[in-house]
């Protein structure tokens, strides 16, 4: 158990260092040596966990997506009414991501430029797992007649598609810097969507 915790701590140190370097120099200029120095580790230790800087970028994204799923699951099982949960979930899937990339928002385009082809495949799985969580809540709402008799899986997919326009890689660095404005627009969209499927 102690060894597992130590491994997680080292991995987090490496990923924290990666995100600081992404803010400072972007993915193209960043080297594994830079990451090791920033994390206060040997290059060998970094390579033990990650084989390349592309792997580091994906691990950083995976860490954010994991936080998103945890937040969605927490909201999904809360005691709030279905409509409130759906709105909070729609907001959370974006705001958790926005907050996570703030430090390196100016270099986010360069990150996706390097990893985009592989990322596009990977994000299908991210979205599929998020949609499953939304579908559970929608199914509950349909069953309790608080929501219209919509198809839960299809509606969950539509809700994700509607909010994808607010994902960090869909926004400019300037928009990413105006999170309050983005959140306001996102909230308005979520209100419209949830109202549209509510009885």
Task: Report residues per predicted region.
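Short secondary-structure transition hinges
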Residues: 94-133, 143
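Basic, helix-initiating cap at the start of DNA-binding domains
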Residues: 1-25, 29-38, 55-59, 63, ...
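Short amphipathic alpha-helical elements of helix-turn-helix/winged-helix folds
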Residues: 17-21, 92, 96, 162
């Amino acid at each position: 158990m102690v060894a597992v915790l130590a491994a997680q701590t080292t991995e987090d140190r490496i990923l924290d260092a990666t995100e600081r370097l992404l803010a400072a120099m972007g993915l193209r200029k960043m080297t594994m040596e830079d990451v090791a120095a920033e994390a206060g580790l040997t290059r060998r230790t970094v390579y033990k966990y990650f084989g390349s800087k592309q792997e580091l970028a994906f691990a950083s994204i995976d860490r954010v997506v994991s936080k998103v799923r945890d937040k969605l699951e927490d909201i999904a099982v809360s005691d709030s009414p279905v409509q409130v949960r759906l709105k909070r979930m729609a907001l959370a899937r974006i705001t958790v991501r926005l907050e996570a990339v703030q430090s390196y928002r100016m270099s986010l385009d360069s990150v996706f430029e390097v990893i985009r082809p592989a990322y596009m495949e990977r994000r299908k799985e991210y979205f599929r797992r998020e949609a499953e969580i939304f579908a559970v809540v929608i199914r509950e709402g349909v069953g309790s007649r608080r929501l219209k008799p919509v198809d839960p899986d299809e509606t969950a997919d539509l809700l994700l598609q509607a909010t994808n326009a607010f994902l960090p890689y869909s926004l400019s660095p300037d928009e990413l810097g105006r999170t309050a404005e983005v959140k306001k627009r996102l909230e308005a969209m979520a209100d419209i969507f949830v109202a549209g499927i509510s009885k």
